[in-house]
Amino acid sequence: MEEMRLKLKAVDARTIDFTPYGKLFNLRAEGEGLCYSCAADYTGSCTAAPVIDTLGSLGYTKSAGLPFTAEQMERHGHTQEAQMPESQPIVFLVAPATDAPRPNAKDVKAVIIPKGYVAVLDRGVWHSASHGLYTESYYYWLANVYEGEPTEWQPIDGGPITVEE
C-alpha cells in the first residue's frame, strides 16, 4: 500500500502571524529592534540586542531546494535558533512549542524567509532543516550548541510532509 503524504504550499512568513514561533527581523529596512549605520560607501544594520538570548555557535548548512519531504522535525528546549538565508530565500516547516512528545502535522506550516530577514525561533518550537526556495542553497544559523545538548528530532505525527512552491 502506498504511503499517503501531506502536501503543503510554502507561505511568506511576512504574511502570517509569526509570533507563535518567534520573531522576524528585516535587516534591509528600518524597524523596531534594529540599529543602523552608513557612510558614503556602505549602509549596515544589526539587531539592537543579541539575536538569541544565550551564547551561540554560528552554523552554515547546505540543503536541497524545493520540493522536499520531512519525516521528522527538531526542537531545542535550551536555546533559541536564528536562521538566515544566504543567496536565496529559505523554506522550513514550523510548528508551535507544545508539551507533546512529537510535532503534529495539523499544526505545521511551511514558511518562506526572504533574503535580508532573520527568523528567530523560540525555545521548544518544532522546525525542519531549511531548504532553498529555488535550488540547492546555503543558510546560516545561530544557536547554543555543545556536546550532549538536548536537541531532539522526532517523527511528525500524521506525516511525512512534502513542501512545494
Map each language-model feature to its residues:
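Short beta-strand-plus-loop segments that form exposed binding edges in beta-rich domains
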Residues: V125
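Active-site region of the double-stranded beta-helix
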Residues: M1-I113, S128-E165
